[in-house]
Amino acid sequence: NTYVATVNSDGKIYAKSLGSTTISYRTYNNKTASFKLTVSGSAVKCLDISTWQGYVDFNKVKSAGYNYVILRAGFGREYSQKDNTFERNYANAKAAGIKVGVYWFSYSTSPSDAYREANACLYCLNGKRLDMPVYYDLEYQPAMSMSNSNYTQMALNFCSTIKKAGYK
């Protein structure tokens, strides 16, 4: 339903009005998948920030109308794989009055690895207070060839571990 949302050629989704729609897409290995998108409120401006953006002036980000950021806490299953700008970005975003969530980039290829990734994420968070959820970024190409049930179990394992630690 293009009245609710549209998808551009890069795969970015743009909410247009309140309502629900189903978005279908083809995965890298030519499988078809879909999800239901519900637009239930006004849109907010939010940035995804990691080491790839270099130094970020969060006061300028705030002045540009962004009230939310999702910071990459890290990637993979080792405690040493914390994003090297995470601590600075977290402190500077909070100091600028920007609400913070985090994501963990997954390199997992099995449901059991997802537990290790969640624990590495929790280690990097070290009890930090978040304003938004912890997101599990599942776009690692080798994992996408897993069965749907294993892929789903991987997400459930990560999310349940994060939730048990008190995060959303």
Please place each PLM-identified region on the residue numbering.
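Substrate-binding cleft of extracellular glycoside hydrolase catalytic domains
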Residues: 44-159, 163-165
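Extracytoplasmic soluble-region selector
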Residues: 1-41
